Amino acid sequence: MALPRSGNTLFASLINQNPNFACTANSITMEIMKDLFLLKQTDVFKNFPDHKSLDNIMDSVYDLYYKDWSQQYIIDRSPVMTPGNLAVMQRHFKQPIKCIIIWRDLMDVLASYIKWFENEPTAFPNKYGKNTIEEKLMMLMNKDGAVAKELVAIQNALQPQYKHMSHIIKYEELVTQPKKILQSVYEFLGIEYYPHYFHNLNQFKINGLNYDDTVVGNNMHTIKTEMRLEDNPYKKLIPQSIINKYGHIKL
């Protein structure tokens, strides 16, 4: 669980070196659970409220979705810790919930977005009639967008009653101390450490599939083959209005 452009794809590329692990792309499983749950609000269901039968399906979503995946451990990438999502999962996911949170400062996330959409014409923020950087960033921060959902999920995960479910890693440490960070993840999961490599990294791929970034914009999920922490000059382009509105958001 992490904000977009916070090292999700890098983390997945690293952890998936272990053949027993599958860290997924952006997952649709939580959307499946939500849509099934919302069926209970429909007139058809209310007319014949067979909760048990629908609950049977919801109890089985994850087992069915990952039925043909060969890996022993699956890290499903979704905003599981929003209050609504967590309530559904606590009822229907029949295993302990463990959540890995990657945190990157929000202003660095937005600077990464700026660098991407200012240099990539196909980037989705360029497709909605938004002309200025401020307009594009405000669109990204929409309350129904991925950034907002992940922020809500992370905020909820940090509540005292849920902290035991979560393990927080910082983007900067993932890049500069990857072995130490991955060791902490294995310890959190209670799994024996696997020797990873940290140079000449592969692009994300799982079960023969990779992202089709023609949907959201080229290079949205492209990672560098070598890890290094760099200053992003595009951070200077973040409008003051955005800083005033969101700059206070910290871990």
Give, region by region, the residue ranges found by the protein language model:
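C-terminal/domain-terminus segments
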Residues: 30-35, 174, 247-251
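A short, structured active-site edge motif that brings together acidic residues
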Residues: 26-30, 102-107, 198-202
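PAPS-dependent sulfotransferase catalytic core
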Residues: 1-61, 68, 204-212
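PAPS-dependent sulfotransferase catalytic domain
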Residues: 76-196, 208-219
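Short helix/strand-capping connector loops at secondary-structure junctions
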Residues: 215-230
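Broad structural signal for hydrophobic residues in well-ordered alpha-helices, predominantly aliphatic
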Residues: 15, 65, 89-90, 158, ...
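C-terminal accessory extensions appended to soluble enzyme cores
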Residues: 226-251
